[in-house]
Amino acid sequence: MQSKFIKHQGATLHYQIGGTETAPVIVLLHGGFGSIADFAPLLPRLQQHYRVIAIDTRGHGRSTLGTAALTYAQAAEDARQILRHEGVEKYSLFGFSDGGTTAYRLGAADKNIEKIITVGAEWHKKHLDGVRPMFETINLDFVKENLPKQLAAYQAANPEPDAEKWAAALKGMWLDEGASGYPNENIRQIQAPCWRYVAKPISCSPLMIGRH
């Protein structure tokens, strides 16, 4: 995998690209407090069959946080910018957790997506009803106590580490109930085949989303 960087809306975004150049493109989007490194076990197999583009979300891995607020809408726009830069027209998405939520936003807005797979990803702000008290406690102390490995990896990899801002940015994204947050009912606009894995795989096609 080759590392590349582009500047976009105040941030330097890091991504890696590899695999078979003429193969279908798959874009990997990691979760909160994670990075491209989370996909390391999958990359050897994926590169045999796909042109793989793995993106460090702004503020994560080797991507700087920049000046724009970290939101699901911003993460989707960052991914679009990278894909435009690489000349990618059609692609599939694999998103874990926050990466899956970003994938839903991309799928709802963009019609050039071939397939979507998400793992442990939320799509509606109503899920906040059960987790808001925990999200509201997130700060640097929370990260130090509960996510020491992720914190150490971030501090080692990020060119502009600021763990307090990092935690605050994610807290803001997770609690965002506005237009820049969860896709909510817009998920019905997804036209690509979509598989959502929680405890078991569930279709997230427009016809199925209301049943789960």
Indicate where each model-derived feature is located:
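Conserved HGGG/HGGXW glycine-rich cap/lid loop of the alpha/beta-hydrolase fold
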Residues: 9-62
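Conserved alpha/beta-hydrolase "nucleophile elbow" surrounding the catalytic nucleophile
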Residues: 30-32, 91, 95-97
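Residue in the alpha/beta-hydrolase core beta-strand immediately N-terminal to the catalytic nucleophile
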Residues: 56, 92, 114-117
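Conserved acidic catalytic loop of the alpha/beta-hydrolase fold
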Residues: 73-91
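Flexible "cap/lid" loop of the alpha/beta hydrolase fold
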Residues: 101-149
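Active-site nucleophile elbow and catalytic-triad environment of alpha/beta-hydrolase enzymes
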Residues: 169-186
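Short beta-strand/loop motif that positions the catalytic acidic residue
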Residues: 190, 196-198, 202
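Conserved alpha/beta-hydrolase "acid-adjacent" motif
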Residues: 203-209
